[in-house]
Amino acid sequence: MKLFIILALVCYWLTCCAPSVAELAKTNPEAVVARKDELLAGKSVSKETLMAVVDAYNTLGSSALKAKNYNEAEKQFKESLVLDNKNKQANYGLAMIEGLRLFKKGNRSALWDSLEKFGKATYFDPTKGEPYYWMGRAYEKKDDGDFELIVEAYENALKGNLNPELKTEVENCLATVKLRQKTHESFWK
């Protein structure tokens, strides 16, 4: 009888105290991805389990994107889309990667295309300010005299969510552009 009670308590502890797949997707996404086939085996996979695997891929993709490892980020986001082809986080990540690659090319045509990709990223996650920051950078690189579009992009970036370092960068870029705009306007008066 004692053994039964101990076993029951151990089983209860394991089921109640072990992290859920959804929690693991955030804290240890590598483990979830490594066990993807096991988690998704069977005919009746729960939506929670499926979304946990999608979240794990997105977490890995976001980390790789932040580290500027675009190939790895792209791979992870594409894996996410295989499981959930309308996933906004994965689509946002892919749009940002494409935009950044085009921005890096630097030619006029690529800059126009990067603006389109950054705009697409804002569609998938309108709360983020980073795509607007890159739009401002692309407008500056394309035509640094187009002050209205540059200022608008940086101001939109500040309305969105930015990490503290990027927020400072955007504020500095905006101040510099406004100063150049003022100098330009006073010169031509």
What label would you give each PLM region?
Residues 84-127:
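Alpha-helical adaptor scaffolds
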Residues 47, 54, 88-95, 129-130, ...:
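Helix-start (N-cap) detector for alpha-helical repeat units in TPR-like alpha-solenoids
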Residues 62, 96, 100-103, 137-139, ...:
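Residue-level recognition of tetratricopeptide repeat
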Residues 45, 151-189:
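Terminal, low-structured helical/coil segments at or just beyond the last alpha-helical repeat
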Residues 52, 59, 93, 134, ...:
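Canonical tetratricopeptide repeat
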